[in-house]
């Protein structure tokens, strides 16, 4: 879904892009007036934010860390199983990766990938201040 631009690069440029992407955080935490908000690409594969974050700082050879990285990038278990339990330790967790017709909440997990890569709308979420918790979609 949209990765053709990367494959068109020569090896050295692909390595440069990979190096830049490797320097990005796996997850983001934002302290808000309502509590801690987590942001991750796909999901955390469980319901324990602190445990997820703790496992991410382990050595790269650690199998648990590898599993957490895999979940952060690819996991769809929660949305495919329509599990609505909250992620402990967070006010809300915002995720993407799985296109949904409109922003969708399962417990305190909010799915905001509304398929812009496929020509559908792009969704933004307000996590602080007036309008916090609201999502806004706009045609791509």
Outline where the language-model segments fall.
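Generic secondary-structure microfeatures
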Residues: 25, 32, 41-48, 98
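Conserved beta-sheet core of the metallophosphoesterase superfamily
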Residues: 77-139
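Active-site neighborhood of divalent metal-dependent phosphoester bond hydrolases
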Residues: 1-29, 34-36, 60, 64-70, ...
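Active-site-proximal segments of metal-dependent phosphoesterases and phosphodiesterases across multiple
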Residues: 44-87
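Short, well-ordered beta-strand micro-motif
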Residues: 29, 39-41, 124-128
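Short, surface-exposed beta-edge/turn micro-motifs
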Residues: 35-37, 90-91
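Active-site-proximal beta-strand elements of phosphoester/diester hydrolases
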Residues: 37-43, 110-112
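Short catalytic/ligand-binding loop motif for oxyanion handling, primarily in non-cytosolic enzymes
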Residues: 38-39, 46-49, 101-104, 119
């Amino acid at each position: 879904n949209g990765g053709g631009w990367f494959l068109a690069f020569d090896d050295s440029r692909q390595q440069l892009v990979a190096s830049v992407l490797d320097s990005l955080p796996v997850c983001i935490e934002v302290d808000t007036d309502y509590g801690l908000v987590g942001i991750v690409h796909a999901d955390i594969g469980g319901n324990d934010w602190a445990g997820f974050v703790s496992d991410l700082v382990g050595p790269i050879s650690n199998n648990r860390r590898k599993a957490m990285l895999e979940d952060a990038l690819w996991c769809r278990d929660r949305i495919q199983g329509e599990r609505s339990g909250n992620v402990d330790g967070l006010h809300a967790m915002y995720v993407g990766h799985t296109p949904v017709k409109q922003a969708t909440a399962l417990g305190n997990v909010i799915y905001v990938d509304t398929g812009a890569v496929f020509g559908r709308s792009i969704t933004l979420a307000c996590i602080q201040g007036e309008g916090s918790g609201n999502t806004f979609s706009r045609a791509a």
